[in-house]
Amino acid sequence: MRFPVWTLVICASAVLIFNSPELRTLLIYDRAAITHGELWRLVTGNLVHLSNTHLAYDLVAFLIAGTIIEIRCYRFFPTLCLSAAILIGIILYGVEPGMYFYAGLSGVVTAAITYLCLHGLTEKGMWRWLCAAMLAGVIAKIGIELMLDQSFLLSVGTEEFVPVPLSHLIGTVTAILLFLMSLSASLEHPKNAL
């Protein structure tokens, strides 16, 4: 069993940034600032949160998924988080020219949950079935969000912020790609199993 270092570092960073207006201003995804060369915002915007509710939703889900991933020693978790953050920022910048600001960890959270579920599908017993059900839920949630063009949580009236369903899809695709690459590597080199 491993201590969830990366999970706690990412959560602590999000809390620190939330409690510092200066850091929020410096790190939020801001299209105009990115266009003028502040490229770090493509990644760091994922750590910025705009309300207590926004932060709480993301932290609870990330703490649970990340802790389980790290305790179960599923490999490449830091790579997953960084890859998802980078791809979310770059893709949103490329395909959402009308989006001037973006903040939140939900796309990375979705990547973590998807990654956890995919690993769980390789195991036996009840855990496998629980992961299959969670993965089906993630896919259904993203489908609903994309059809309604809003977050599932917003459709039940509980959000104070504007969600970006595309970030959840990007997170899921990132998790699937990294999982398949790690699976392929473990098949080529059995000593480096997942």
Residue ranges and their predicted role:
Residues 15, 66-67, 89-94, 116, ...:
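Alpha-helical transmembrane segments of multipass membrane proteins
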Residues 140, 145-194:
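C-terminal transmembrane module of polytopic alpha-helical membrane proteins
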Residues 1-40, 82, 117, 121-130, ...:
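N-terminal signal-anchor transmembrane helix
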Residues 90-118, 122:
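Membrane-proximal helix-loop-helix units in multi-pass membrane proteins
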